[in-house]
């Protein structure tokens, strides 16, 4: 028997990624000051983080983390079900549930882990089905595959497509899962219409609101609250602590019955160390600031509107998004990488997003905004985007003979 050589396989795949301009590189951040990063000795203004409210370096949150670390140490030392569930975890879960209007919350180390836990614990039969938007986050897609149930995907934002998929699978338990705000397009799911489909088809509605929490809705309560929905229409939702709240971790919110079931059966919850207490303390303080500081959301929305208006004035091909995620369509990978490099030479860090993260031919620059950005930074970024587009267009133009 001759097995395939894994080293040869990965070298072959690496060559293919090089040819397709799809290799990935980690950048080492030496220092951070708000939206300014030092990389290789140079300071860049970043337009690619998820620190939407500018809380990642907030002094109150840092103080809460330091105090909790001094009292509880740097780690939880065990899983939640052994001896890793601290009083600060309980307080954070209570605050999340009260803020978002859900009976209970359950903490996880990351949104990816939480999505794995939800589907593994709920969709336990082979004929169960999870119907998802085609552009859902990879963690939702992978969770269904790992759960072993059926996966059906509908065209992006297509409510009728979701209904069709559920109608065609009447047997087995069903879940209708969607992002709240889509991480690569920045648009918002039609949650009211989808919740009606879920109710009609007796499917459990599950919303991953990683990018909505803190940013949209009353008191920053996210996309579900912005759509005037509640636990009755959306029995289960996921929020992250790592984006608008500036820290690390995630939580799933739902009825007492659902949350207790997850705590007792979800393997990614049971068999992993609890979130560090200091991170929980930081998240608790961040939530209170996010609830209190409405001006951060107002400021962020003003910057979104300014970026979009300036981009339209310069003829930039921005996608249809009213959120802090503002993608600029570039088409092929080579052009996208060239524009990203040109922006870096002008002092901006904007990442190139390429397949398989986005569909073929849909490579883009994913601009993300923060309440910490200044209007001058917004304006100069748009000017730099327009210059890099024009320069690349000139270089690509055929020579007249």
From Swiss-Prot:
SUPFAM superfamilies: PLP-dependent transferases (SSF53383)
UniProt keywords, alphabetically: Biotin biosynthesis, Pyridoxal phosphate, Transferase
An example Gene Ontology molecular-function term: 8-amino-7-oxononanoate synthase activity
Cofactor annotation: pyridoxal 5'-phosphate
Disulfide feature: none
GO biological process entries: biotin biosynthetic process
Modified residues (N6-(pyridoxal phosphate)lysine): 243
Keyword Transcription: no
Subunit structure, interactors included: Homodimer.
Function: Catalyzes the decarboxylative condensation of pimeloyl-[acyl-carrier protein] and L-alanine to produce 8-amino-7-oxononanoate (AON), [acyl-carrier protein], and carbon dioxide.
UniProt protein name: 8-amino-7-oxononanoate synthase
Species, as recorded: Xylella fastidiosa (strain M12)
């Amino acid at each position: 028997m001759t097995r395939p050589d894994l080293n040869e396989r990965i070298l072959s795949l690496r060559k293919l990624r090089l040819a397709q301009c799809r290799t990935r590189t980690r950048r080492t951040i030496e220092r951070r000051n708000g939206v300014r990063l030092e990389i290789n000795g140079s300071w860049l203004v970043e337009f690619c983080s998820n620190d939407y409210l500018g809380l990642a370096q907030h002094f109150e949150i840092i103080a809460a983390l330091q105090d909790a670390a001094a009292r509880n140490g740097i780690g939880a030392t065990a899983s939640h079900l052994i001896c890793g569930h601290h009083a600060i975890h309980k307080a954070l879960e209570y605050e999340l549930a009260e803020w978002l209007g859900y009976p209970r919350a359950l903490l996880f180390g990351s949104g990816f882990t939480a999505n794995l836990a939800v589907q593994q614990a709920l969709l336990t039969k082979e004929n169960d089905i999870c119907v998802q938007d085609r552009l859902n986050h990879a963690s939702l897609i992978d969770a269904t595959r790992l759960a072993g149930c059926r996966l059906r995907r509908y065209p992006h934002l297509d409510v009728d497509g979701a209904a069709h998929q559920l109608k065609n699978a009447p047997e087995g338990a069903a879940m209708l899962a969607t992002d709240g705000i889509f991480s690569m397009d920045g648009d918002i799911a039609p949650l009211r219409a989808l919740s009606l489909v879920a109710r009609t088809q007796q499917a459990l509605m599950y919303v991953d609101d990683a990018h909505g929490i803190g940013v949209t809705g009353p008191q920053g309560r996210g996309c579900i609250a912005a759509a005037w929905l509640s636990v009755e229409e959306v029995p289960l939702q996921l929020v992250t602590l790592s984006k608008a709240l500036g820290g690390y971790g995630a939580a799933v919110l739902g009825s007492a019955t659902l949350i207790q079931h997850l705590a007792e059966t979800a393997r990614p919850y049971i068999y992993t160390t609890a979130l560090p207490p200091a991170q929980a303390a930081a998240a608790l303080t961040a939530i209170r600031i996010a609830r209190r500081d409405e001006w951060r959301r107002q400021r962020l929305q003003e910057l979104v509107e300014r970026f979009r208006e300036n981009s339209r004035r310069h003829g930039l091909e921005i996608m249809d998004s009213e959120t802090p995620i503002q993608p600029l369509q570039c088409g092929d990978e080579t052009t996208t990488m060239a524009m990203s490099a040109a922006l870096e030479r002008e002092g901006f860090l904007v990442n190139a997003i390429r397949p398989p993260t986005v569909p073929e031919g849909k490579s883009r620059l994913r601009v993300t905004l923060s309440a910490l950005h200044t209007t001058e930074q917004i304006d100069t970024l748009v000017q730099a985007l327009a210059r890099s587009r024009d320069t690349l267009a000139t270089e690509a133009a055929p020579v007249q003979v």
